[in-house]
Amino acid sequence: MVSGIASSAGESNFAEHAADTHRAGADLCEGDVVSSTTGSAVSHLAQLEQWGLNLRRDRNGSPYLGQLPGQSNPRTAGTGDSTLREVRLILEEQCIKRNIPRRGDIEILNIVMKNDSVKGLVALDVQTGEIFAIQSKALVLADGGFQSAWNGDSSAMGSSCALALREGISLANLEFTSMHPLTVADTTLRLPLDLLGSGGVVIGADGQPMSMDDGPDALAHSIIEAGGAALDLTNISRSAATWFANVAENLQSRCGIDYSEAQIPLMPIANMTIGGIPTDESGRVVNGGWDSTVNGLFAAGDAACSALHGAALNSGDHLLGAIASGKSAGGAAATQASSSKFSGSSEISIALSEAHHMHDSMLSSTGSDGVSAGTIQSSLATTMQTHMGMSRSASGLAKAAASIQQLQETAVALSDSSPVMNTELVNLLRTQSLLSVASASVSAAHAREESRGNHVRSDFPTNDTEP
């Protein structure tokens, strides 16, 4: 969700923050994870500030805290419309400072496992076309979700979720998809929720402000049910407006809207997925039950599902959850690596050979027959928007499952046979991953015969007593 970082910096303790998170999550949040994450939020924020995050401040010099949808108190700190970018830059600086090697243009093809224990991975160097293996004591899957299935873009293709799925790891809570309420109608431009904590108001069709009591997903669903809404930013002060200069520029250049004079039409779209690779409080991947972990495998970020968010996301918890899960998984992986030995050389060798064969087979089958990966993605987005949108039903989900299966069986044209910098091949691999995770999410939505959080079934309009 596009917003700052929630913490109880302005409260006596984190109890209400935790309660708000549980309430938004509709009884599907994991209590220990919620307590540890909300309880450590202030320290995470302080650490980022120490590393150089230039937080917006109030008149007393304290971090400015905005009250966003689903928050019982002002709780969200940030840097206006650039919080995510600033946090990413600061974390990259810390990687450089610590001489942590990073490699780009690497596509992970497979995780190598034996007896529920990670041995390494096989990857493709996109720049050179080389397929290589890395033996590892611990592996952290820190990745995005799979919301590209709805949006038709390549920002979140579910690659890590697909890697886990191929190894027989059951994914969790895939039926829950968060929609961003402040999306400009007929565009993909998502405005930060922080605007609502700085004087912005969502106006319904009746001309009255819409409720922000029940969280951003509830607000998004209300907007969709009403056929749209408008965002009024005319009451944002001049001092606050300086923190949203990018918003003003994007609205003017992309939509021709001056928010100081005109209201902004809204229509929510899928913004992030909540489910993914199930993890415990320490980021260890679990499979088949919360007491059964996969040795050496960890997950963090949007690819992970620690059940922090439950059935719906609350304001300010998205970035907080990513930071907290990254720290937990990284620390646990380091501990694992320090006490383990390398193993699985023969399994890695076999996996490497199989990857070479698959790669050569895909490149040798280039030709004009079939459709492009982009066409597949566009068709998938149409299917997901139609049948896996705000309201779902058994008949619609059955149609979605059949459509995705047909897309998986469709021949895809690959015109470039060169192994070097073959971005067309990479897009095909990612599209295959996205299809597999999208199929699993439709199955999960079909299996949950109730309405809970942001999963709404028109044929099961109420929720079960037991989640």
Question: Whereabouts are the PLM-identified features?
Answer:
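Rossmann-like flavin
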Residues: 24-64
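Glycine- and aromatic-enriched mobile tails/lids
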Residues: 1, 6, 47, 53-67, ...
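Conserved N-terminal glycine-rich FAD pyrophosphate-binding loop of Rossmann-like flavoproteins
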Residues: 1-22, 26, 152, 181-182, ...
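Glycine-rich loop(s) and the adjacent beta-strand/alpha-helix scaffold that form part
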Residues: 138-189, 307, 315-332
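Alpha-helix capping and helix-loop boundary segments enriched in small/acidic/polar residues
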Residues: 5-12, 32, 79-82, 127, ...
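FAD-site-proximal beta/loop scaffold in flavoenzymes
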Residues: 110-128, 132-133, 261-308
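Conserved redox-cofactor binding core of oxidoreductases
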Residues: 50-130, 135-138, 142, 180-187, ...
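An anion/pyrophosphate-binding glycine-rich loop and adjacent beta-alpha core
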Residues: 163, 169-270, 332, 336-338
